[in-house]
């Protein structure tokens, strides 16, 4: 069954006064975003040399672990240089297939575990390159009250905003945590949201491949029919931000 996204107007009572003006600004920004970044050449912007170099540097700074192939960030660089054109061509013609992510469980303070999906370095670079371009498309559309995982935004700024609201007379704050959000993310819903701003079907198909790439756990590859691995930049960006 096809999932449809419906907004929830009035959910944030504190922002109800500014909602109308914000919605009008969203409408304008959406049109501009489509003209600027949602055209049929979005994949070429993702595969631009400068964007890919920036993506690799970001992956390197993060010092992440190796994926299922056991290749580290430093070891991947010579391969990327040697096979660059072959890799880019396979992405362009749609033959590229992402590798399954490596499952890793991180203990949580409450005694549970947080499941991470660690992609290979090559896939991390590609996903980071995608995420960088998705960020430029969606950033103008996000609520001004959103502070999580955004450039030049921080938890400290969110706390400061709560203090300002308290000084204005507001007395209640709500803390919400969605249980197993990334583990149960609906792929069809996510792709519908992406399609609203992206017309380059090659990009949509590539993101969907990452969602469906599977998980390797104890040497066994399992299909991923729902959920988004916490570890890949592109699917993590989409999972965190698009349902706003």
Give the label of every model feature segment:
Residues 75-98:
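Amphipathic alpha-helical blocks
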Residues 68, 132, 176-178:
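Residues immediately flanking
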Residues 127-146:
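Electropositive, glycine- and tryptophan-enriched low-complexity nucleic-acid-binding patches
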Residues 110-128:
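Glycine-rich active-site/cofactor-binding loop and its immediate structural neighborhood
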Residues 90-105, 109, 141-244:
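Conserved polymerase palm-domain catalytic core
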Residues 55-59, 129, 206-211:
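Short alpha-helical scaffolding segments that buttress acidic/His motifs in well-ordered protein cores
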Residues 55, 126-127, 183-185:
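Short helix/loop capping segments that flank catalytic or ligand/cofactor-binding pockets
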Residues 1-79:
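Non-catalytic, polymerase-adjacent accessory regions of viral genome-replication enzymes
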């Amino acid at each position: 069954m096809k999932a449809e996204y419906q907004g929830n107007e009035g959910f944030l009572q504190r922002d109800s006064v500014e909602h109308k003006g914000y919605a009008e600004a969203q409408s304008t920004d959406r049109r501009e975003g489509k003209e600027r970044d949602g055209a049929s050449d979005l994949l070429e912007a993702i595969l631009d040399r400068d964007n890919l170099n920036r993506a690799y540097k970001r992956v390197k700074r993060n010092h992440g672990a190796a994926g299922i192939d056991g290749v580290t960030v430093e070891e991947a660089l010579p391969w990327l240089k040697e096979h660059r054109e072959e890799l880019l061509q396979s992405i362009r013609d749609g033959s590229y297939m992402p590798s399954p992510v490596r499952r890793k469980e991180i203990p949580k303070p409450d005694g549970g575990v947080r499941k991470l999906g660690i992609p290979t370095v090559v896939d991390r670079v590609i996903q980071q390159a995608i995420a960088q371009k998705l960020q430029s498309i969606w950033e103008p559309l996000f609520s001004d009250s959103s502070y999580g995982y955004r450039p030049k935004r921080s938890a400290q700024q969110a706390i400061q905003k709560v203090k300002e609201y308290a000084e204005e007379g507001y007395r209640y704050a709500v803390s919400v945590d969605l249980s197993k959000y990334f583990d149960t993310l609906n792929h069809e819903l996510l792709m519908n949201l992406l399609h609203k701003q992206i017309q380059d079907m090659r990009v949509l198909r590539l993101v969907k491949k990452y969602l469906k790439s599977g998980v390797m756990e104890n040497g066994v590859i399992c299909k991923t029919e729902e959920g988004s691995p916490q570890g890949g930049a592109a699917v993590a960006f989409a999972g965190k931000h698009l349902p706003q």
